[in-house]
């Protein structure tokens, strides 16, 4: 039984589990996550607009 433990220890030292590629490391996943993050980081053109009914200071983008 101790031989199996020694063999397992040697194998884990030579080939650690962190060397295996994970699903999150795939380039396609990273590109999709980056694209999704860019979509959410765009400003909303309606944010900060005045409430309805529009006052004279409103822009046509918000009120029109």
From Swiss-Prot:
Modified residues (Cysteine amide): 63
Tissue: Expressed by the venom duct.
Propeptide part(s) removed at maturation, as residue ranges: 20-46
GO MF term set: ion channel inhibitor activity; toxin activity
Pfam families: Conotoxin
Transmembrane segments: none
Keyword RNA-binding: no
One CC-aspect GO term: extracellular region
UniProt keyword terms in alphabetical order: Amidation, Disulfide bond, Secreted, Signal, Toxin
Domain of life: Eukaryota
Major localization class: secreted
Span of the signal peptide: 1-19
Disulfide links within the chain: 49-58, 50-62, 54-63
Compartments in which it is found: Secreted
Family according to the record: Belongs to the conotoxin M superfamily.
Domain topic, free-text comment: The cysteine framework is III (CC-C-C-CC).
Name of the protein in question: Conotoxin Mr3.5
